[in-house]
């Protein structure tokens, strides 16, 4: 997979299961890649907007980040709000279950969230 760095995100493509190709984009900030999601129907833009809004909030603690089942879907939740939902395609690309992937993403975010300093 080739990756092109553009500002806060990395864009790439991944061939999977023969003829099926997914567009995968990674959310990265200050050199830390938080997660790579399948960008279906511009889903990445929504996740990036949510992350940008999160970066403007003062006092977010690692304990505010969790993995939770919301309406039957595994998600990364910050202060009770869904940041990203793990899709079947995400789990397939990462070769794991949706639950495990949401736990990995939540851990990565919680390990680094306190180092994100709001600019305002």
State where each predicted segment sits.
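N-terminal targeting peptides and non-cytosolic leader segments immediately upstream
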Residues: 18-120
């Amino acid at each position: 997979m080739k990756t092109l760095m553009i500002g806060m995100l990395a864009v790439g493509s991944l061939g999977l299961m023969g003829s099926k190709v997914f567009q995968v984009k990674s959310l990265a900030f200050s050199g830390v890649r938080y997660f790579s999601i399948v960008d279906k129907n511009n889903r990445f833009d929504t996740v990036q907007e949510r992350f940008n809004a999160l970066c403007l909030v003062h006092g977010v603690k690692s304990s505010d980040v969790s993995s939770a089942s919301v309406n039957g879907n595994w998600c990364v939740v910050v202060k009770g709000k869904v940041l990203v939902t793990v899709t079947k395609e995400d789990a397939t690309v990462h070769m794991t279950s949706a639950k495990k992937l949401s736990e990995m993403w939540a851990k990565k975010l919680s390990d680094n969230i306190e180092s994100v300093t709001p600019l305002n």
